[in-house]
């Protein structure tokens, strides 16, 4: 008897477990079909692909018991995939859903916006008079998905009686939560929506089970999209994590990727720059209002087996105290344990997801995969790369490709190389090194130490073809300089891909964030050193953005 959580082997379900524990509730995991009979309330969180979810539920003998549980009238709360499986089908694959809601799940229209829909957006209650199930109209909730149930009363009037809230992305309205009888589901992730999300979870869990049984049907009405959606710009705090010379894991920050102190003193000469402990800093940035956190492992732990990796312990500990999205980078590749056990990239990523990560960031391995794709004619990958295997299992929204380019200066009058169409031209009032010059952006691997015969445009487009759901754009020339984001680079990449893009490298002030959001259509911006050194506080940064009429989460 009691509350059960269903995990079919999805991405990060640990964060929901951490949320429930933090809120003071007890639960058990569903481990066998009989647990559905024991459960008096069921929560089904899920991140990943619809087809994979249905397949895994069937393989484990849980699909039919899940359907019977929902039909029994006992309280059910589905999150993301846990909501989508209630529908008839998904254009993501051929598998059929449970058919509880007579409507298909379809992909977003990518012609006027980036897909996946990724970030913090509002949720508008369709019938406020019937209660809001913990959803606050003034709050933002975290979404990350490429497929949605369109709000379509003309073609699916019966399905629309399930609508509890709608959300607008671009000019599309979709069901961001559903409710009827004892069933509740959210497309957004309350466990990743900060205090607003925790309040929603707590509200549902504290409601007496008898009160879950009578949620009314929603009125079917025409809803018109607003001129603009409420999706916010995201501020991401990044922490480069490595072992210092004493063996402790610390957050450091490089100057053009060099993380060792240059000041010559007895204590610091050549030492790894130490800016704090990763778990404590992550908690600090969460409390300060960071929209996402990124932990980049820049130390090799080749002598540790996968399950003993120090970064896994960092992720587990951080996920217990932060309830916003967490990206992990570094080491997401095929590897071999000290005892010779092979660990494919998919298994490595899965370990981080189960520890509490939401996305994985892939760097050098993405370059090698796109080189292979280019050699094969750009059609499609062979399915073996880390990008492809992880995206297939967990959805493309779980895969970030991190690009580390360098500028290559050329004489625009004489350059006739293959990247002429990608050249950026220096401005007369720009830095002296850029005047009368042009340059293209060359990709690197191994932390910027090795250049490859590939441009940033080739890598970004190739990564999207292979299945990346987000592109993180760094620039070695600007890293740690405080000169501001390279707006030309950000605009170049945004023009070439349809997935969300994160600007990185060079932030030195709040104005630099204002500039990148004003001058480019980028979805998010990332910084590290200025936050670590408290040169810019996240709260002050958001105030500056709001003062410039840039929509951000409070």
Task: Report the location of each language-model feature.
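Pocket-forming structural segment of enzyme catalytic cores
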Residues: 88-168
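C-terminal helical cap(s) of enzyme catalytic domains, especially alpha/beta-barrels
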Residues: 370-380, 387-390, 514-554
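Catalytic cores of alpha/beta
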Residues: 322-359, 409, 488-525
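Cysteine-nucleophile active-site neighborhood
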Residues: 47-121
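Active-site beta->alpha loop and helix N-cap motifs at the rims of alpha/beta catalytic domains
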Residues: 286, 290-292, 296-366
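Acyltransferase
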Residues: 182-225
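Conserved N-terminal beta1-alpha1 strand-loop-helix module at the mouth
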Residues: 218-322, 378-382, 389, 393-401, ...
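Glycine-rich beta-strand-to-loop/alpha-helix junction loops that act as flexible
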Residues: 45-51, 79-83, 296-298, 326-336, ...
């Amino acid at each position: 008897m009691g509350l059960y959580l269903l995990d079919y082997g999805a991405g990060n379900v640990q964060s929901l477990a951490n949320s429930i524990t933090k809120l003071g509730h007890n639960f058990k995991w569903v481990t066998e079909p009989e647990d559905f009979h024991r459960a008096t309330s069921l929560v089904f969180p899920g991140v990943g692909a619809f087809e994979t979810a249905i397949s895994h539920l069937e393989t484990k003998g849980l699909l039919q018991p899940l359907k019977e549980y929902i039909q029994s009238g006992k309280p059910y709360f589905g999150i993301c995939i846990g909501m989508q499986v209630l529908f008839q089908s998904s254009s993501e694959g051929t598998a059929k859903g449970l058919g509880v809601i007579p409507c298909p799940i379809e992909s977003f229209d990518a012609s006027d916006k980036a897909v996946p829909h990724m970030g913090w957006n509002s949720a508008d209650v369709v019938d406020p008079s019937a209660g809001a199930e913990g959803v606050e109209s003034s709050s933002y909730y975290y979404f990350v998905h490429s497929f949605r149930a369109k709000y379509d009363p003309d073609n699916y009037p019966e399905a629309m009686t399930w609508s509890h809230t709608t959300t607008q992305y671009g000019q599309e309205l979709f069901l961001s939560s559903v409710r009827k009888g004892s069933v509740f589901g959210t497309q957004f992730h309350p466990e990743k929506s900060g205090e607003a999300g925790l309040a929603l979870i707590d509200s549902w869990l504290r409601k007496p089970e008898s009160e879950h049984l009578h949620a009314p049907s929603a009125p079917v009405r025409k809803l018109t999209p607003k001129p603009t959606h409420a999706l916010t710009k995201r501020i991401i705090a990044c922490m480069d994590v490595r072992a210092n010379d004493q063996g402790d894991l610390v957050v450091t920050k490089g100057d053009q990727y060099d993380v060792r102190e240059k000041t010559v003193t007895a204590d610091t000469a050549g030492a790894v720059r130490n800016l704090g402990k990763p778990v404590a800093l992550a908690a600090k940035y969460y409390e300060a209002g960071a929209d996402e956190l990124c932990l980049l492992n820049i130390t090799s732990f080749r002598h540790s087996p996968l399950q003993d990796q120090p970064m896994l312990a960092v992720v587990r500990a951080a996920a217990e105290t932060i309830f916003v999205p967490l990206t992990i980078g570094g080491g997401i590749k095929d590897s071999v344990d000290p005892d010779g056990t092979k660990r494919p990239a998919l298994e490595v990523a899965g370990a981080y997801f189960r520890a509490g990560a939401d996305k994985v960031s892939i760097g050098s391995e993405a370059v090698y995969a796109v080189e292979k794709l280019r050699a094969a004619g750009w059609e499609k990958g062979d399915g073996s790369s880390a990008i492809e295997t992880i995206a297939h299992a967990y959805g493309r929204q779980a895969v970030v490709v991190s690009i580390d380019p360098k500028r290559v200066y050329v004489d625009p009058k004489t350059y006739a190389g293959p990247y002429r169409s990608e050249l950026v031209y220096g401005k007369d009032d720009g830095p002296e090194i850029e005047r009368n010059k042009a340059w293209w952006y060359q990709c690197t691997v191994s932390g910027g130490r090795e250049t490859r015969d590939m441009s940033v445009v080739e890598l970004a487009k190739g990564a999207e073809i292979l299945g990346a759901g987000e592109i993180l754009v760094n620039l070695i020339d600007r890293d740690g300089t405080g000169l501001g984001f390279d707006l030309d680079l950000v605009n170049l990449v945004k023009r070439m891909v349809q997935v969300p893009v994160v600007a990185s490298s060079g932030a030195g002030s709040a104005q630099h964030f204002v500039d990148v959001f004003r001058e480019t259509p980028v979805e998010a911006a990332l910084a590290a050193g200025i936050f670590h050194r408290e040169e810019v506080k996240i709260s002050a940064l958001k105030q500056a953005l709001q003062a410039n009429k840039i929509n951000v989460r409070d």
